[in-house]
């Protein structure tokens, strides 16, 4: 098929699907695919990071009186936040075994991360009909807001389980499922702005879902997966049109693209999602840089941002089967495993941070204590002490990928610097008094960025 197909001869949905097929030919809404070797992926990562994650900022600095700072004034410019979202689920906040461990969990989370995934699993969130656990969410949200941490809710719709009280009638069950989306997104409008709307729809009808969520699974089957997806996302959008809506899946093959992503559009063909979520639990084997890059390239063809929503690299023995038939198996972190985890985590984050389509990485789980599957998945050990992988990430996220610099003010209060995209604090002296201003800066920021210091 030629890339010169006339747009006027097709509807918008066909065009969206065509963009996925023709992405390597340069479809305007998609990134061109790049096939790179491991040496190229890693060797060129720093250059890509500089290209996609940093820029030149032109500031216009004003004092409290609205007048430009004096020519020659010295200013300190310090980053306070990343635009890129470095996150983890926050399920263990206030649920660790001891107060000291709770305090350590809070500190290590807020020291490293700016993004948190909050739990909304229906079967545990609403154990009695009409009584969702909003109070616990409000406590989590208050802590995140106090620490300037962006929040995401996960998941609004997932048929891996279901409330014990869910009606057996399929139409009633699906009506309640959709109403839940409306209620939750509307309730937390202004607090939680990102949502995993539908989880794992590609292979929704599998053994575990038929066992754990039989009514919901049958309801999706009866409704049709496309209508299920469209209705869920339309509900979320109506409840908060400003929210960022994520489709999330563990499937990383073309099936996800063909069965879900290309189908998730309204009647005009406009995509109903804002972000493609990619799970990346590496319990059995760590992904190579080539695998990670290829997955980025595969889904970047859709022309929408990518979030790596559930990232796991173990610091112990690898394999899903280790606890099969032996739930008491001590799946512990090991010294050798921690060294391997440090290396692979560093490579994994470097590759993702260097890819222009990726906007977020969420680690699953921050600590071994309470980790999914009981695996040594954390960046912290069970006692909340940091593993080498945590320390390595901290050196990247708040070190190599973080900006602290100084500048001299030129005429009309202008000052320039080169830095990573995000939030900043600028400090200057005015007649012996320290004055401070804040600003944000990214690739789309209008220049100059005007900053008032007080």
Where in this protein do the model-derived segments appear?
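Bacterial N-terminal signal peptides
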Residues: 16-26
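Short Pro-Gly-centered beta-turn/loop motif in secreted/extracellular proteins
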Residues: 98-111, 416-423
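Substrate-binding cleft and catalytic face of glycoside hydrolase catalytic domains
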Residues: 115-129, 137-245
């Amino acid at each position: 098929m030629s890339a010169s197909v006339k747009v006027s001869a097709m509807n918008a949905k066909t065009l969206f699907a065509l963009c996925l097929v023709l992405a390597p030919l340069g479809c305007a809404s998609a990134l061109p695919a790049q096939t790179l070797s491991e040496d190229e992926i890693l060797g060129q990562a720093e250059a890509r990071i500089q290209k996609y994650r940093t820029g030149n900022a032109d500031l216009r600095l004003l004092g409290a009186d609205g007048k430009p700072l004096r020519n020659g004034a010295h200013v300190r410019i310090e980053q306070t936040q990343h635009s890129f979202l470095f996150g983890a689920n926050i399920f263990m906040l206030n649920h660790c075994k001891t107060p000291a461990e709770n305090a350590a969990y809070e500190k290590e989370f807020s020291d490293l991360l700016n993004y948190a995934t909050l739990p909304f699993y229906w079967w545990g969130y609403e154990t009695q009909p009409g009584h969702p656990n909003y109070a616990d969410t409000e406590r989590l949200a208050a802590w995140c807001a106090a620490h300037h941490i962006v929040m995401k809710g996960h998941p609004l719709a997932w048929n891996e389980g279901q409330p014990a009280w869910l009606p057996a009638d399929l139409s009633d069950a699906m009506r309640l499922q959709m109403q839940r989306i409306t209620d939750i997104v509307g309730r937390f409008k202004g607090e939680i702005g990102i949502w995993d709307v539908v989880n794992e729809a590609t292979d929704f009808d599998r053994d575990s879902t038929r066992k754990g969520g039989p009514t919901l699974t049958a309801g999706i089957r009866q409704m049709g997966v496309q209508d299920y997806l469209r209705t869920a996302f339309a509900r979320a959008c109506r409840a908060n049109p400003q929210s960022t809506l994520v489709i999330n899946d563990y499937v990383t093959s073309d099936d996800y693209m063909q069965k879900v992503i290309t189908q998730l559009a309204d009647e005009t063909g406009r995509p109903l999602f804002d972000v493609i979520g990619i799970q990346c639990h590496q319990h059995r084997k760590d992904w190579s840089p080539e695998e990670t890059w290829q997955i980025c390239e595969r889904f970047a063809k859709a022309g929408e941002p990518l979030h790596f929503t559930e990232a796991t690299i173990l610091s112990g023995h690898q394999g899903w089967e280790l606890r099969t038939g032996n739930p008491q198996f001590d799946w512990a972190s090991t010294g050798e495993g921690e060294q391997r985890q440090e290396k692979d985590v560093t490579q994994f984050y470097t590759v993702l941070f260097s890819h222009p389509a990726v906007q977020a990485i969420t680690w699953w789980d921050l600590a071994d204590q309470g980790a999914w599957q009981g695996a040594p998945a954390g960046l912290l050990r069970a006692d909340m002490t940091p593993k080498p992988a945590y320390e390595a990430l901290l050196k990247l996220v708040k070190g190599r990928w973080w900006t602290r610099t100084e500048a001299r003010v030129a005429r009309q209060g202008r000052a320039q610097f080169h830095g990573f995209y995000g939030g900043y604090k600028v400090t200057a002296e005015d007649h012996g008094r320290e004055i401070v201003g804040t600003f944000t800066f990214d690739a789309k920021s209008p220049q100059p960025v005007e900053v008032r210091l007080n």
